[in-house]
């Protein structure tokens, strides 16, 4: 167990009464030997969390390419360091909340905000032993998720309490419950090593990654292993990833899970390599950058990607060309990669008789997905996007759709919306042929108008044809369900200028530029918002955020007063530099954009701090106390 582990639930007629009842529960806990960090968990004599394992290492996986020893023997220069990162939380503003109603007819309805209501339904079914056909989950607006709302905490409990009481039951977590009881991301220990020639060619790379899983196995170390070296073409690689259990809340996904942690280590060493070789850090990246056909550590060959394009866009930007004002100002650059995901998706497009369309999708909207899906439909049909009314359907009204995560929403649900629109287009062309009593081959749809290819007098707008639907067979409904492959990889390169107060250790960010390959930017302002949001979370991770764990294993800073996330007062305007290398495997070239933006900031900040104070920072967070300690120890 861990502090925050759920042990009891109470239903009452008011929150106040429930809190009073909770206070009457007296549990006597015996504090057993426990382990809070990776290094404690794998130390000799550490208490064993799970008897089915011989130690606290739940799994050990290896990715290998080429021969690392041969690669290191070719190197003129080797750099290696140890790195540590603290446990951090996703920091969504809306706490977990769910309402459950076990009806007299023995059906369950759940209202909740999550990243995947079908997954909530399926997991609630599994926990309660109730068929999925008896459970309906109605998705509510979500106040932030970032991977943290991909699992169940409350939904089965609300249903059980409802069954007992006969009334709908709502549970909303307090902030301390969110921080202590729900999945953060991993703390870590890493040892990373690079070898390179004096000309700058990276010959070999090795990483030893040990990630906290929390109380049960399942850290993002596998994703970290797949991402850590992927921005570069390196012939000889070895990555050992260890999933390690410890007495903390079970980890869950956090925006590009695992990738920011690994990138912090790798990109810090890339910067150090460039310095020791005497090479511009972006030139080093350009020389070694991954491109189409480069083999990753996983053995996958890259499709068309925009990695080097982000390096070059950053180098060409006026931010990089500008001079720093004083020696106290540091400049740092770092790059990152995220895998991007996909999954099952469904979309249904109902044509109204006035020419508008009600579009129902199965993906939760956590980053602007509804308007993006609407844009796919509008583009196919040539009608204004304002004529599309997008909504997220519940589990009874739209086909199964996988959760919104992995930067896969716009790719899979955008594609499903595209295919649903194609279905609408096909049916509407048939209706136009019926109205004009002509061959389907004679009609085409251009810019929202149905046109007869040989009779210029025959022309109807989409809305005009929609008005004829009642007389030509009734409603037109376009449907699509798919599970598309090829979501496209995401790369980003970030540049930051900051000032360090050497007396206090305070870091002030002066300028931040984030270049990212977005494929085709379907909604550029939303793409910018996703990039900016990821950067802000990465800055918080780099400078402030961490779980403070006391000797008893409890979190001591489980409030937003003490768990310090950045606000607008801590940040400059983030300059989002959109690089467009369209994904050839999507109808409109879409790549996921939501996650990779959080990957480079940790190392970019560390490299800029080094540039300012001359000390390499190898532990997160780099708060004022840590910076003062580093300066004093230099």
Label the predicted regions.
Residues 1-515, 571, 605-606, 610-613, ...:
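Structural alpha/beta core scaffold segments of enzyme domains
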Residues 257, 404, 408, 579-597:
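Amphipathic, heptad-repeat alpha-helical segments used for oligomerization and assembly
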Residues 389-392, 566-590:
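Generic long, charged, amphipathic alpha-helical segments
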Residues 526-527, 548-567, 589-592:
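Hydrophobic alpha-helical bundle architecture
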Residues 585, 590-634:
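In a subset of proteins, long, contiguous C-terminal domains/tails are tracked
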